[in-house]
């Protein structure tokens, strides 16, 4: 597979060597468990069924999960093993299947979800640096998009994530996510069923970047779009 799943478009044959994401073509999972520290409408009372994929197409310098994003953690999984992992999380009462950093495995994710057809909402929890072609491949398979929108400032994006085109790529990706799933919808218990939640982490000394991101959201996305503003930056 010559990989073009994300905007980096490495063109690397991941059956032979790793690309920027430091990941082979075979899915590697680092952790799968109920998680209670997502947004309240995602975690609810039972927890979110989080599935952490190894590797990352951004690898931000301030990453809180660097052991996972570095690509070395975890174990390889077949499609059947991934689906069995999903089953175990649902049996534990997970409100959803929360796929964390799945971008560089999106082709495998699409193939698995085509076969699996989850009984609970599927959350695509990503860094926002996405390819339109990849997102269109996921249409109808993802119920909730939970992207970061990290940067409107290309200099920050280059310095911290080696992605100077982040704003352009994330902007078009989030518009596509909104087209697919629309404004967030909750059930009677306040649990997310479908829609878009945009996350943004405020970076130290970069309030102007945050203002630009929020302005873009206000001017570009529908009224009622849910924004999760975060402050847990860790140096």
Describe the predicted segments one by one.
Residues 84-235:
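Conserved AdoMet/S-adenosylmethionine-binding subsite of the radical SAM
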Residues 2-61, 65-72:
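N-terminal [4Fe-4S]-dependent radical SAM core
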Residues 36, 68-71, 78, 157, ...:
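Hydrophobic alpha-helical segments
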Residues 34-37, 81-83, 126:
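Short acidic (Asp/Glu) patches
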């Amino acid at each position: 597979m010559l990989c073009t799943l994300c905007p980096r478009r490495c063109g690397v044959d991941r059956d032979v060597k790793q690309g920027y994401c430091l990941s082979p073509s075979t899915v590697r999972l680092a952790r799968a468990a109920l998680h209670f520290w997502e947004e309240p409408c995602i975690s609810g009372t039972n927890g979110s069924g989080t599935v952490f994929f190894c590797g990352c197409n951004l690898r931000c310098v301030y990453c809180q999960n660097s052991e996972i994003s570095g690509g070395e953690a975890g174990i390889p999984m077949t499609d059947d093993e991934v689906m069995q992992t999903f089953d175990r999380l649902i049996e534990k009462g997970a409100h959803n299947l929360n796929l964390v950093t799945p971008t560089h495995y999106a082709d495998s994710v699409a193939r698995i979800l085509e076969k699996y057809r989850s009984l609970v909402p599927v959350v695509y929890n990503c860094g926002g640096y996405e390819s339109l072609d990849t997102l269109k491949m996921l249409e109808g398979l993802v119920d909730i998009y939970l992207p970061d929108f990290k940067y409107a400032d290309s200099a920050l994006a280059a310095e911290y994530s080696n992605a100077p085109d982040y704003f352009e790529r994330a902007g078009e990706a989030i518009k596509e996510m909104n087209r697919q799933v629309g404004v967030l919808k909750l059930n009677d218990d306040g649990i997310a069923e479908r829609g878009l939640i945009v996350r943004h982490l405020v970076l130290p000394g970069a309030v102007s970047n945050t203002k630009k991101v929020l302005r873009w959201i206000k001017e570009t996305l529908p009224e009622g779009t849910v924004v999760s503003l975060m402050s847990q930056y860790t140096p």
